[in-house]
């Protein structure tokens, strides 16, 4: 087949081209907010519209377009859906063996207040998982835990998506930062430093914001000491680790420091009033569990599934383990790489999105052993043995997990199909170039480019791979620091995670809200836009006023 070159301005006017390119996204917003369609229905129609735009407007060859849709769908199944299946399976093992009652009791013994439980589980534990694994696992695990603690499913999912803003940029051992460095040629350590001078401000704001969502102004007044301890310790550790150690460990270090500081603080301080969701939508929790006399050994045993999960995911994430499966590694043959027919290197990305015409690779990687989902599955198998779960119960639990997640898995596949047709057709790059045409105001809109990238792909890493080079080029054209705008792509991207169709589908799957994706999207969308504007203001101030903050 001939090499097809992407054309980012088929209409001859970048604004008209971007309007047509935005049709699938506008439909997706409309389908969830106004039509209130189920997630899998909205995603299916969005793929159909994106495919039509790619074929009719961008003149993408039919074979290339269909191949990108199929590639995206299978990428949604592996590795994304695999992570969710394994994570939900671990949670179900904990529930089925009766250990979750003890976990619930241990958290209630620290604090019965659900606002503070959100800080411990949703923020601290979630940030740790984000640093170790990323790619949807933190939200799936923490949201399921919070539902078990009595949170309303919608609130558990929505709050976990919002609070996940703080750690995403340094997620999965700093991969988003490392990728940004690779595609721009800028030192990834410096990018991490710059992100570490933007995100700490957002961390504090996000935690106060979460308290306001849960309990209004009263919630802020009653919990501010705990928020300052949790958010302040996290922000300081995030700044110090990103600026003096590197981009790989800020989430791990910050989350552990925050968890330790908050837990010690709550031994000395509790809010004057205990807050709990009283609506019927929340599962009822027996408050006497907080006073049940479980021994330290029983509590430790109950937490073992999640300790195993933490250990295996961390092991799978460290560079020496990853190197085994990289090209030239001892176990590289265990990774099956399949070039996608009719797509691999048959589409060319063109300037100014890249510096020169570049063939777009499309290789499906079936890393059956080194995938994060497999690490979580190992944790599940260890838990089954450790907790002496009957094999028949384990098999039935895994079967019920697959059955419950069948529809969400399809949704995730269609969401990734939309992301891939957007990327390979050039649709996403058209939207990016339109934003880059805003001149000196681009410092404000720069984070929106990262936001758009994460919305489309569900990943800050993928957003940087798509748009970081464009950010650097735009920065040079308007005379501001390319380091600043590449960092803004990363920082802005974290605010798009909470409304990414992929994240919405994962969160709904984890808490049993299948078919309620529109409710969750409406819950998070306004917060996402507000946070992105905040990052835009911070970036603009750093570009023109606070230039001393740039490394």
From Swiss-Prot:
Highest taxon in the source lineage? Bacteria
* Spans through the membrane: 13-33, 37-57, 70-90, 131-151, 159-179, 194-214, 244-264, 366-386, 405-425, 438-458, 494-514, 530-550
Keywords associated with the record: Cell inner membrane, Cell membrane, Membrane, Symport, Transmembrane, Transmembrane helix, Transport
Catalytic activities: (S)-lactate(in) + H(+)(in) = (S)-lactate(out) + H(+)(out); (R)-lactate(in) + H(+)(in) = (R)-lactate(out) + H(+)(out); glycolate(in) + H(+)(in) = glycolate(out) + H(+)(out)
Q: What is its main location?
A: membrane
Gene Ontology MF annotations:
lactate transmembrane transporter activity; solute:proton symporter activity
Q: Where in the cell is it found?
A: Cell inner membrane
The terms describing its cellular component in GO are: plasma membrane
InterPro entries linked to this entry = Lactate_perm (IPR003804)
Q: List the membrane topology term(s).
A: Multi-pass membrane protein
Q: What are the coiled-coil residue ranges?
A: none
Q: What does this protein do?
A: Uptake of L-lactate across the membrane. Can also transport D-lactate and glycolate. Seems to be driven by a proton motive force.
Family to which the UniProt record says this protein belongs: Belongs to the lactate permease family.
- This one is known as L-lactate permease
What species does this protein belong to?
Escherichia coli O6:H1 (strain CFT073 / ATCC 700928 / UPEC)
């Amino acid at each position: 087949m001939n090499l097809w070159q992407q054309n980012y301005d088929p209409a001859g006017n970048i604004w008209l081209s971007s309007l047509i390119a935005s049709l699938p996204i506008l439909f997706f917003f409309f389908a969830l907010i106004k039509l209130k369609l189920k997630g899998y229905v909205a995603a299916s129609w969005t793929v159909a519209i994106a495919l039509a735009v790619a074929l009719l407007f961008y003149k993408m060859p039919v074979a290339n377009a269909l191949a990108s849709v199929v590639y995206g769908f299978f990428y949604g199944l592996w590795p994304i859906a695999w992570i969710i299946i394994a994570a939900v399976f671990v949670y179900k093992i904990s529930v089925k063996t009766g250990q979750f009652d003890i976990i619930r009791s241990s958290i209630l013994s620290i604090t019965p207040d659900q606002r503070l439980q959100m800080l411990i589980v949703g923020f601290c534990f979630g940030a740790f998982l984000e640093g170790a694994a990323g790619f949807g696992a933190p939200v799936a695990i923490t949201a399921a835990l919070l539902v078990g603690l009595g949170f309303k499913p919608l609130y558990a999912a929505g709050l976990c998506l919002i609070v996940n803003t703080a750690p995403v940029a340094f997620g999965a051992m700093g991969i988003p930062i490392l990728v940004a460095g690779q595609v721009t040629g800028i030192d990834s350590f410096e990018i991490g430093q710059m992100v570490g001078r933007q995100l700490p401000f957002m961390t504090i704001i996000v935690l106060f914001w979460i308290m306001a969502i849960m309990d209004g102004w009263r919630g802020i007044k009653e919990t501010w000491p705990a928020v300052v301890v949790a958010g302040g310790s996290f922000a300081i550790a995030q700044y110090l680790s990103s600026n003096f150690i590197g981009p790989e460990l800020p989430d791990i270090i910050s989350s552990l420091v925050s968890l330790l500081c908050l837990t010690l603080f709550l031994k000395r301080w509790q809010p004057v009033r205990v807050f709990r969701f009283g609506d019927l939508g929340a599962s009822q929790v027996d408050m006497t569990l907080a006073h049940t006399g479980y021994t330290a050994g029983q509590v430790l045993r109950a937490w073992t599934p999640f300790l195993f999960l933490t250990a295996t995911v961390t092991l799978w994430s460290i560079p020496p383990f990853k190197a085994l499966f990289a090209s030239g590694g001892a176990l590289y043959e265990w990774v099956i790489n399949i070039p996608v027919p009719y797509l691999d290197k048959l589409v060319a990305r063109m300037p100014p999105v890249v510096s020169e015409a570049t063939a777009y690779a499309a290789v499906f990687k079936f890393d059956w052993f080194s995938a994060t989902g497999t690490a979580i599955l190992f944790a599940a198998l260890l838990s089954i043995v450790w907790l002496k779960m009957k094999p028949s119960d384990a098999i039935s639990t895994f079967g019920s997990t697959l059955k419950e997640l069948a529809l969400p898995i399809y949704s995730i596949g269609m969401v990734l199909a939309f992301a891939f047709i957007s990327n390979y057709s050039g649709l996403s790059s058209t939207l990016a170039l339109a934003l880059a045409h805003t001149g000196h105001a681009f410092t404000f809109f720069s984070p929106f480019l990262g936001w758009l990238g994460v919305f489309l792909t569900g990943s800050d890493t993928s957003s940087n791979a798509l748009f970081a080079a464009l950010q650097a080029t735009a920065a040079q054209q308007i005379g501001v620091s390319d380091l600043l705008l590449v960092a803004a792509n990363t920082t802005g991207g974290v605010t798009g995670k909470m409304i990414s169709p992929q994240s919405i589908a994962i969160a709904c799957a984890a808490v049993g809200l299948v078919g309620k994706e529109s409710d969750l999207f409406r819950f998070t969308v306004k917060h996402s836009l507000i946070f992105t504007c905040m990052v835009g203001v911070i970036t603009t101030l750093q570009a023109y006023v606070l230039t001393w903050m740039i490394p």
